[in-house]
Amino acid sequence: MIENLDKLTSEQLEEVKKQLTQINSSIEEQQAQPIAEFFNKHGWVKIDKIINKETADLFYLYCVLATERLNVLEQIEGVGNVNPHHYGMFDDPQATGDYSKYGDLIFDTLLYALNDKMNLYTGIDLIPTYSYHRLYTTGTELTKHSDRPSCEISTTLCLGFDNSNLDKSKYENYLWPLYVKEKDGTEIPINLEQGDMLIYKGCELEHWRDRLMGNNHAQVFLHYNDKKGPHNIKYDGRPFLGMIDDEKTTIY
């Protein structure tokens, strides 16, 4: 505890603030070191509660309302007549029928905001490429795949889900596992609670999900590149964050 804090000059207070910031930064780096070591050994690592419940609830509701908005727009304008770049789509081949959207500003903001933590958790100097969010629905299966270069270092963050259709006596703690295949062939199931995030090497590790049993499940994917790597695709070729993918200056 700092004594006589009320007697310090403004310059002294600023110096104290600076020193405390440096101490906190050093502590955070020390705590992140074993996380980065695990990530670089296995190609993935799980981070618990990267965002709190209140923030996750807000993002989950955002995904649900965006889905309902697109449903209403398609009823008014007709299927295929709504701009997917602005309002999202239901025809992503990876999850046909489920709502998906590329590069939404709110999630690109989250992508940007987590950049420093991602640097610590991976031990890599990263650059943000793009975000992508999706609201999965009952029966959706994510087939085994790896990702394109802009997804070199990826995250998938659980925003929330609705399992109210399930029999609680059988599925009281049901989570929808994500599987990753490590380089040695080991297949690892990873369960994410609301607010949890998985960091993984999207281009190297195959990943997939079995069929979803719950009503819905919202995830956001946050993608990064290694600044010193072969790709370094800033903003996925877009001029800036929050821009739609047909405004790319470079195609990857």
Located regions from the model:
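Conserved double-stranded beta-helix
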Residues: 89-95, 99-100, 109-172
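Non-heme Fe(II)/2-oxoglutarate
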Residues: 2-121
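A structural signal for short, well-ordered beta-strand segments and their strand-loop junctions
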Residues: 46-49, 127-129, 199-200, 221
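Acidic/histidine-enriched, glycine/proline-rich intrinsically disordered or flexible terminal extensions
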Residues: 235-252
